[in-house]
Design a protein with these regions (language model features):
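N-terminal periplasmic accessory domains that precede
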Residues: 1-4, 12, 16-39, 50-53
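Membrane-embedded beta-strand positions of outer-membrane beta-barrel proteins
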Residues: 2, 22, 36-40, 65-67, ...
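Transmembrane beta-barrel domains of outer membrane proteins
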Residues: 5, 25, 53-57, 66, ...
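Outer-membrane beta-barrel pore domains and translocons
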Residues: 7, 25, 39-45, 68-70, ...
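Hydrophobic, lipid-facing positions within transmembrane beta-strands of outer-membrane proteins
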Residues: 20, 34-38, 48-52, 84-88, ...
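Strand-connecting loop/turn motifs
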Residues: 31-33, 47, 58-61, 95-97, ...
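Solvent-exposed loop/turn segments connecting transmembrane beta-strands
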Residues: 40-50, 75-81
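Flexible loop and strand-edge segments within Gram-negative outer membrane beta-barrel domains
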Residues: 72-79, 83, 93, 97-146, ...
Length: 175
């Protein structure tokens, strides 16, 4: 489930939530056992979308692991896109009042931009990897609740924003 909250929400989500918040509530296994799910879709322009998920709940332990692969040739030459993604979340309930969890999300994609039909671009490619990890300790009592959370975001972007046809990329543009 995705919640979009417009306007300042710094009281609930921290001082950087001045313009709004996108809160992604991940699915978790409610009943005991293991649940697997796989989705595959194929369409025009050699477009492929895949996702696999595994959810586990055993006693106080829970986990979610997902992986995805998406690609397309695009509707024009030199407009390819390819994406790999992975997500893992582990949780443990110490009691009915206290739980701890941690997760990691990593996505890598390769994309090509051919420019406009009137002004084509050559070798305008991007290779981007983004990641996020978090850890939380939560408590929920009848009249009070609280969470101590830590977040870390990171990324590596390699973007070739254009150079002359047949020339090598300029080092300071490709980092």
């Amino acid at each position: 489930r995705v919640e979009v909250l417009r306007g300042p929400a710094s009281v609930l989500y921290g001082s950087n939530a001045m313009g709004g918040v996108i809160n992604i509530v991940t699915r978790k296994q409610q009943e005991e056992g293991v649940k697997n799910n796989m989705q595959v879709g194929y369409g025009s322009y050699n477009t492929l979308q895949t996702e696999f998920s595994n959810r586990v709940k055993k006693g106080c332990f829970s986990s979610v692991v997902t992986g995805s692969y998406n690609r397309t040739d695009g509707h024009r030459p030199d407009m390819e896109f390819e994406q790999y993604g992975g997500y893992a979340k582990l949780g443990y309930n110490f009691s009915t009042f206290w739980k701890v969890w941690g997760d990691i999300n990593v996505t890598h994609f390769n994309a090509s931009n051919p420019g406009t039909v009137q002004t084509p671009l050559f070798d305008n490619d991007s290779r981007i990897t983004r990641g996020m990890t978090s850890f939380a300790l939560e408590n929920h009592y009848e009249k009070t609740s609280g969470t101590l959370s830590f977040f870390y975001n990171w990324g590596r972007h390699k973007i070739n924003d254009g150079y002359g046809t047949g020339e090598e990329p300029i080092d300071d543009r490709f980092n």
